[in-house]
Each structure stands twice: as structure tokens, then as C-alpha cells.
């Protein structure tokens, strides 16, 4: 079996609520860390989510 070109990552809320999303990204195309604006259900607002490694 070959290795997947996609890496599983965790998107952590910048609001400090410890809420996170998991997603995948292509290792060869996206070398920079991802920042996305997504909904945080804990504070019920859209905030920036930063990429972190999934342990």
C-alpha cells in the first residue's frame, strides 16, 4: 500500500474555547499552515481556527 498524500490535521479555535475541527490537507501543495474562519459553537460566533498537528 502506498502512503496517502493527504495529512490529517486539527483546526483549533483562537478564542481559547478548546473547540476544534479535524480535516485533511494535501502535504505537497499546501506547505503553509492553514487559517480558516469557522463557527465556534461554544461562544456562538465565527472565529479564526489555526492548524495544529493531530496527536
UniProtKB/Swiss-Prot annotation:
SUPFAM superfamilies: Zn-binding ribosomal proteins. The keyword Nuclease does not apply. GO terms for cellular component: cytosolic large ribosomal subunit. Gene3D superfamilies: Ribosomal protein L33 (2.20.28.120). The keyword Ribonucleoprotein applies. One of its GO terms (molecular function) is structural constituent of ribosome. InterPro entries: Ribosomal_bL33, Ribosomal_bL33_sf, Ribosomal_zn-bd. Keywords: Ribonucleoprotein, Ribosomal protein. NCBIfam families: PRK00595.1 (NF001860), rpmG_bact (TIGR01023). This is Large ribosomal subunit protein bL33. The gene is rpmG.
Amino acid at each position: 500500500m502506498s502512503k496517502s498524500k493527504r495529512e490529517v490535521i486539527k483546526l483549533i479555535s483562537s478564542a481559547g474555547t478548546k473547540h476544534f475541527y479535524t480535516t485533511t490537507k494535501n502535504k505537497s501543495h499546501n506547505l503553509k499552515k492553514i487559517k480558516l474562519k469557522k463557527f465556534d459553537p461554544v461562544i456562538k460566533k465565527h472565529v479564526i481556527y489555526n492548524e495544529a498537528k493531530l496527536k
